[in-house]
Curated annotation (Swiss-Prot):
Binds 1 Fe(2+) ion. This is Peptide deformylase. The keyword Protein biosynthesis applies. Belongs to the polypeptide deformylase family. GO terms for biological process: co-translational protein modification; translation. Gene3D superfamilies: Peptide deformylase.
Length: 147
């Protein structure tokens, strides 16, 4: 495993839409392991592939209950509203209030290629939606409620 360089705000890769992962192979598994190591080293709760310069539809989250890997994720449903401060490893030191759904239902593949669905609320829902945004070139500062 290796630490990857986290791309910072201003890097054009953070504004690009990611492509679907076509196959789960040894290179992708290595990328996932590297992303986990990088996220934990930076004290993050999530990291998306474009944040390490890879334009693939892949992100990881861990809010303290163990890591979750999302490959080619889809958002199936959202509900409710919550406003809370968000930060991002690509914008170190910056936080802003962001309104997000309080509930999300998502479908993705895990690192073994197995499809799963997850229902999440509060912090986990926020983390999933934040990382999902990265796959479409959206940053949390685009969604801030601060004027």
């Amino acid at each position: 495993m290796a630490l990857r360089n986290i791309r910072k705000y201003g890097d054009s890769v953070l504004r690009k839409k990611c492509r679907e992962v076509e196959k789960i192979d040894e290179r992708l598994v290595t990328l996932i392991k590297d992303m986990l190591e990088t996220m934990y080293d930076a004290d993050g709760v999530g990291l998306a592939a474009p944040q390490v310069g890879i334009l693939k539809r892949l992100f990881i989250v861990d809010i303290g209950d163990g890591p979750l890997v999302f490959i080619n994720p889809e958002i199936l449903d959202t509900d409710g509203k919550q406003v809370d401060e968000e930060g991002c490893l690509s914008l170190p030191g910056k936080t802003e209030p962001v309104m997000r759904p309080n509930y999300v239902k998502a479908r993705a593949l895990n690192e073994k290629g197995e499809e799963f669905e997850i229902e999440a609320e509060e912090l986990l829902a926020r983390a999933i939606l934040h990382e999902y945004d990265h796959l479409n070139g959206t940053l949390f500062i685009d969604r801030t409620t601060k004027k």
